[in-house]
C-alpha cells in the first residue's frame, strides 16, 4: 500500500450505476505523521482507474465523517432535445415537447421539508424518510462542447434538472 498500513476509505454516500460524482468527499485515517498530501495525491491518481481522480487531500478533525457530516447533496439530471453523440453517456435524449415553466412549477412542490417515503426502496431501514429539499429546478444550458465548437443551439436544446437536499433516500 502507499501508506504502508491498512486503511479504510469511507465515502459520502452511494451512487447508482451510470452516475458520475463531482466533488465527492471521502475520509480515511492514517498514522503517517506529516503526510505530504500533494505527493500522496499524485501517487493515488497514478494507480486509480481512468474514470476516477482525486483533486485534493485535506486534513480533517478525527471526528469528521464524510457521510454523516455532509450538509447537502446535489444531483443533476440532463436532457438533450436533439441528437448529440457527445451527450449519450450523460444525458437522456427526449425529443417530445416540454413545458419548462410547468416542469418548474412541479419541481417547486418538492421544495421544503417533506416525507419522501413514497420514493424510497421498499423495505428500506431508514430511521426517517424526512428530507429537506433546498433547490429543485429546470434550466436551459449550453454544454461546453457546443459552446467551444460554435454549434448553433436553441434555448431549450439542453436542459438540466438540479435538486439539492440535506439527504436523499435510497432509490429516491
Label each PLM-derived region with a short phrase:
Residues 2-172:
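Structured-RNA-binding interfaces characteristic of tRNA pseudouridine synthases
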Amino acid at each position: 500500500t502507499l501508506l504502508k498500513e491498512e486503511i479504510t476509505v469511507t465515502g459520502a454516500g452511494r451512487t447508482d450505476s451510470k452516475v458520475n460524482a463531482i466533488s465527492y468527499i471521502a475520509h480515511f485515517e492514517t498514522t503517517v505523521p506529516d503526510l505530504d498530501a500533494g505527493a500522496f495525491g499524485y501517487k493515488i491518481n497514478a494507480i486509480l482507474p481512468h474514470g476516477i481522480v482525486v483533486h485534493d487531500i485535506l486534513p480533517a478533525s478525527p471526528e469528521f465523517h464524510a457521510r454523516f457530516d455532509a450538509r447537502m447533496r446535489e444531483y443533476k439530471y440532463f436532457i438533450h432535445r436533439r441528437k448529440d453523440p457527445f451527450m449519450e453517456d450523460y444525458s437522456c435524449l427526449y425529443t417530445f415537447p416540454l413545458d419548462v415553466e410547468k416542469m418548474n412549477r412541479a419541481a417547486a412542490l418538492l421544495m421544503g421539508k417533506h416525507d419522501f417515503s413514497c420514493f424510497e426502496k421498499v423495505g428500506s431501514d431508514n430511521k426517517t424518510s424526512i428530507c429537506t429539499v433546498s433547490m429543485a429546478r429546470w434550466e436551459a444550458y449550453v454544454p461546453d462542447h457546443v459552446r467551444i465548437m460554435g454549434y448553433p443551439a436553441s434555448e431549450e436544446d439542453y436542459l438540466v434538472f438540479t435538486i439539492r437536499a440535506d439527504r436523499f433516500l435510497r432509490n429516491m
